[in-house]
Regions:
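Detector for C-terminal structural segments
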Residues: 2, 6, 17-21, 28, ...
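Short, solvent-exposed loop/beta-turn-alpha elements that line the ligand-binding surface or hinge
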Residues: 87-120, 156, 199-228, 248-261, ...
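Alpha-helical secondary-structure segments
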Residues: 142-149, 178-184, 229-230, 259-261, ...
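Surface-exposed binding/hinge segments that line
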Residues: 165-210, 235
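Ligand-site clamp/hinge motif
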Residues: 219, 247-296, 307, 426
Length: 565
């Protein structure tokens, strides 16, 4: 199991490299980059170790079928729409990203793009593609596919399109030749390279053939894959499971012990997840269960539970455009009523109390921000200043949405309810399936007053925990459910994105965090550790920092005759 110190250095490196200035952009995507702890780019790998003798557990069922147990449904299989971990899991295995995250250095590195350069003082990015990549129908992946895929994202305006919408017009995406594509931004864009880890490429010919009423093939991609990824979609039962088979001619090749099939089953009850893993019927879990679930799985002879620091925030975004949480004093009362110590130590079981939106392990975190502590006297003081009385708050009603079927989520809701009850405030805890939660997040009117959200880094940059949460152009996603910004916050975040100097950019992100916290748009609860359950007969798992990249099934193999039992 990796040590915390090694992993922490690598996390710092992840963000430092992802925010690399355009002057460092270059040939093979493996440039040495500035880090906040002064370490070089040569730390030991983030590979999680198997049992001491390397033998894994005894043979069981499963063979070369990889079974991932997901605690939430897959809302979409279109890579242009993916924004959460199950959607990212599908994209990561069915498609290829332009740039990936190196598993050893956690830096952005070559993938479909084998090299890149900048022109016009960092305003234009030019990518040279590999010449040995084919889609699952056997046709070669070319610059035309890359250009179409990014144009498609900009036109659909979904998923992570906000990374580029304000900076890149489709008319400025240029195919120079079969292997070269250029993106001419309307200004220098500091985190550009980091953003392309969330840009997945589709087969332009197949998608265009299956467009319906200008949907850019969206309906088609809900039941079919059109990628160059390691696996090809066989079946998707929305809300239940996806199944995929290995693409024989995948450009990265296969080993004898690679997984022939990949499937993910949605199981929301922790007791069922634990039983499935204990009986050797599952290969891997997600990271969103309660601490007791992982402790119990770690005691199983056939399951191991790695634990490493991660770039993640757990918080309750407070809907700032909906009464009564549109009142800053109500928001402050809610925040001071919450029991942070119990949340971190008893429910999550590790990590630390968050200090603002950017995880404390991330370069660019504002170290001047102080973690919150429960203070019921202060909570009552702010409540007395509010435009709403306790009676009016209760008459309007406060809704707290939690993800259905997850014990940790339920306990967090109850802990929040207990604190608010001390103030005389009633709280409705509303368990929802993830797909319904994300649907409701598309408008301020339908978004709950507060919602349990785990927000993992979406790219190697603090932009992920600032711009994506608090810039108006990002509103309408589960990530931005506070519906909060100001002109000053928006301008500061825009200045951060314009800067091509790493240190200047990080300073702007720190400035933005201070402005954000003043408005109390969230109850910032924790920066949890990363834990998952892994069957002992799975090898090759690596922590890679960015959400869902850890679940690249092609990078893992089976030891033994099947799953350990």
């Amino acid at each position: 199991m990796p040590t915390g110190n090694i992993e922490r250095r690598k996390l710092l490196k992840l963000i430092g490299s992802g925010a690399t200035s355009v002057a460092l952009a270059g040939c093979q995507g493996t440039q040495q980059t500035e880090t906040t702890d002064g370490s070089s780019g040569s730390d030991s790998t983030a590979t999680e170790q198997t049992s001491d003798d390397g033998s894994g557990g005894s043979g069981g069922s499963g063979g070369n079928d990889f079974h991932f147990i997901a605690g939430q449904v897959f809302g979409t299989l279109d890579p242009a729409e993916q924004v959460d971990y199950t959607q990212g899991l599908a994209a990561q295995n069915l498609y290829d990203e332009l740039i990936t995250v190196d598993a050893e250095t956690l830096q952005p590195t070559a993938h479909i793009a084998e090299s890149w350069d900048t022109e016009d003082e960092g305003q234009t990015w030019v990518f040279t593609l590999r010449d040995d990549v084919t889609f699952s129908d056997g046709t070669p992946l070319t610059a035309d596919d890359v250009a179409y895929s990014l144009t498609r994202m900009l036109e659909l305006q979904r998923g992570y399109s906000s990374f580029w919408l304000d900076y890149l017009d489709p008319s400025n995406i240029t195919v120079r030749d079969e292997r070269t594509v250029a993106f001419e931004f309307n200004q220098a864009y500091g985190p550009a390279l980091a953003t392309f880890v969330q840009f997945y490429i589709v087969n332009s010919a197949v998608v265009q053939e299956n467009e319906q009423d200008g949907d850019y093939g969206n309906a088609y991609l809900q039941n079919n894959s059109a990628g160059s990824g390691a696996y090809v979609l066989d079946n998707w039962e929305q809300g239940n499971s996806i199944e995929a088979s290995a693409y024989e001619d995948y450009w990265k090749g296969w080993s004898e012990d690679s997984f022939d099939t990949f499937r993910s089953t949605v199981i929301t009850e922790e007791s069922t997840i634990k039983t499935t893993m204990q009986q050797g019927e599952g290969d891997m879990t997600d990271q969103y269960m309660g601490t007791q679930a992982y402790a119990e799985m770690d005691s199983y002879s056939n399951v191991r539970v790695p634990e490493v620091p991660q770039l993640q925030l757990f918080h309750f975004p407070l809907n700032c455009q909906k009464a009564p949480t549109d009142d800053i004093n109500v928001r402050k009362a809610i925040a001071y009523a919450f029991d942070y110590d119990s949340a971190v130590n008893d429910i999550i079981g590790g990590g630390g109390v968050a200090a603002g939106p950017v995880p404390r392990e991330m370069a660019g975190h504002n170290g001047d921000l102080v973690p919150m502590e429960q203070d019921l006297d202060k909570a009552k003081e702010f409540l007395d200043k509010a435009d709403y009385s306790v009676e009016e708050i209760n008459e309007i009603g406060l809704e707290h949405v939690v993800v259905a079927g997850t014990e940790l989520q339920r306990q967090m809701g109850l802990l929040n309810q207990a604190g608010l009850n001390e103030l005389g405030i009633d709280l409705e805890i509303n368990p929802l399936q993830w797909a319904r939660l994300t649907d409701r997040a598309t408008s301020a009117e339908s978004t709950a007053h507060m919602t349990n959200i785990f927000h993992t880094a979406k790219m190697p940059s603090p932009d992920s925990h600032t711009y994506l949460m608090y810039h108006p152009s990002s509103f309408g996603s589960y990530i931005s459910q506070s519906w909060y910004s100001t002109d000053e916050i928006a301008a500061t975040l825009e200045e951060a994105r314009k800067s091509t100097d790493l240190q200047s950019r990080l300073e702007k992100y720190e400035e933005a965090q201070a402005l954000i916290v003043e408005g109390m748009p969230s109850v910032y609860i924790a920066n949890p550790p990363y834990r998952i359950g892994i069957n002992e007969n799975v090898e090759g798992w690596q922590y890679r920092g960015v959400m869902s990249f850890d679940w690249d099934v092609h990078s893992m193999t089976r030891s033994g005759e099947g799953r350990a039992k």
